């Protein structure tokens, strides 16, 4: 699987749901907690096309978006190919990487 980064805060239920889904898929990820970290949140927003909500999920260089976006990929059967480096459709409306 390719590298996965997820920006979170401690008490965010959507962050916990995203981590549960990724863990259920057997995906290893790096969690970046931006609780009380203005620089970390600014870095996240810069990478996430201005989005400031958490979670923000990146699979390789692909910005997936938040939990709803991750769940939509799973529902459409596109999450496993993305996690395995076979992104043909692009995530979050972006171009395929």
Explain the meaning of each model-derived region.
Residues 90-97:
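Short acidic DE-rich linear segments
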Residues 59-88:
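Non-catalytic, surface beta->alpha helical segment in thiol-disulfide oxidoreductase systems
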Residues 16, 39, 65:
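Residues that form or flank phosphate/diphosphate-binding pockets in enzymes
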Residues 30-32, 62:
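Structural signal for short hydrophobic segments within the conserved structured cores
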Residues 49-58, 68:
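Structural micro-motif
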Residues 1-30:
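Local sequence-structure signature of Cys/Sec-based thiol-disulfide redox active-site neighborhoods
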Residues 34-52, 78-85:
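Thioredoxin-like thiol-disulfide oxidoreductase module
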Residues 20-22, 45, 70-73:
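Short, glycine/charged-enriched secondary-structure capping and boundary segments
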């Amino acid at each position: 699987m390719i590298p996965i980064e997820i920006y979170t805060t401690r008490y965010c239920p959507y962050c916990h749901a995203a981590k549960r889904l990724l863990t259920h898929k057997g995906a290893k990820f790096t969690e970046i907690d931006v609780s009380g970290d203005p620089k970390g949140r600014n870095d996240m927003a810069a990478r996430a096309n201005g989005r400031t909500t958490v979670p923000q999920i990146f699979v390789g260089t692909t910005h997936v978006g938040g939990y709803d976006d991750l769940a939509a990929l799973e529902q459409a059967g596109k999450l496993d190919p993305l996690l395995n480096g076979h992104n043909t459709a692009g995530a979050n409306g972006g171009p395929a990487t």
